[in-house]
């Protein structure tokens, strides 16, 4: 079991099994490019707090792999988040968004999928006003602009009939 060292943006070094670290395509490519080394792999876009959470996620999924299903079908389902992942994503919004950015940067598709599904579930069924409130977004449209947008997008409104 070989170990690799990862260095967060705030210069904290983590030592982890290479096999687990390689769940990140970015890290796997870095290891392939630079070869095995005692020097830590720098991850300038990930803080130690977030990297620690990401590594916890990777350790768990390395020990408890998810059953392989039909990826295309699973990607579209928002309500099929496994219990561990659901609990993992029960964090404050800034942390959730940092996890999304880290998963994207590190190219860990399952983590990116579950964090994005979590955000999608946060806004499912909400009005634009409710979504603005959830994400603290200022509405900078005039009432006239808003009405025009509503008219242009009437076709995609859910009218309650399935």
From Swiss-Prot:
Location of region: Interaction with the F-box domain of F-box proteins: 100-162
Disulfide bonds: none
Annotated positions of the 4-hydroxyproline modification: 143
Major localization class: cytoplasm
Pfam family, one: Skp1
Glycan-linked positions: 143
Keywords linked to the UniProt accession: Acetylation, Cytoplasm, Glycoprotein, Hydroxylation, Nucleus, Ubl conjugation pathway
The keyword Metal-binding is annotated on this UniProt entry: no
Subcellular localization(s) per the UniProt record: Cytoplasm; Nucleus
Residues recorded as bearing N-acetylserine in the entry: 2
Post-translational modification: O-linked glycan consists of linear Gal-Gal-Fuc-Gal-GlcNAc.
An example Gene Ontology biological process: protein ubiquitination
Classification via InterPro entries: SKP1, SKP1-like, SKP1-like_dim_sf, SKP1/BTB/POZ_sf, Skp1_comp_dimer, Skp1_comp_POZ
GO cellular component entries: cell cortex; cytoplasm; cytoplasmic SCF ubiquitin ligase complex; nucleus
SMART domains per record: Skp1
MF-aspect GO terms: cullin family protein binding; F-box domain binding; identical protein binding; WD40-repeat domain binding
UniProt cross-references to PANTHER family, sorted A to Z: SKP1
Comment field (misc): There are two genes coding for Skp1, they only differ in a single position in the coding region.
Protein family according to the UniProt entry: Belongs to the SKP1 family.
Subunit record text: Multiprotein complex (SCF) with cullin and F-box-containing protein. Capable of undergoing aggregation.
Record-given protein name: SCF ubiquitin ligase complex protein SKP1a
């Amino acid at each position: 079991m070989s170990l690799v060292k990862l260095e967060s943006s705030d210069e904290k070094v983590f030592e982890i099994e290479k096999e687990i670290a390689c769940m990140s395509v970015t890290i796997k490519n870095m290891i392939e490019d630079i070869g095995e080394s005692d020097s830590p792999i720098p991850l300038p876009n990930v803080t130690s707090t977030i990297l620690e959470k990401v590594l916890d996620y990777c350790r768990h999924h390395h020990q408890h792999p998810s059953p392989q299903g039909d990826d295309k079908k699973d990607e579209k389902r928002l309500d099929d988040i496994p219990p561990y992942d659901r609990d993992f994503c029960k964090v404050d919004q800034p942390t959730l968004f940092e996890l999304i950015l880290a998963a994207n940067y590190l190219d860990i598709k399952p983590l990116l999928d579950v964090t994005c599904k979590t955000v999608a579930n946060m806004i499912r069924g909400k009005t634009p006003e409710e979504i603005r409130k959830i994400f603290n977004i200022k509405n900078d449209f005039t009432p006239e602009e808003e009405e025009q947008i509503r008219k242009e997008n009437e076709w995609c409104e859910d009218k309650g009939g399935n």
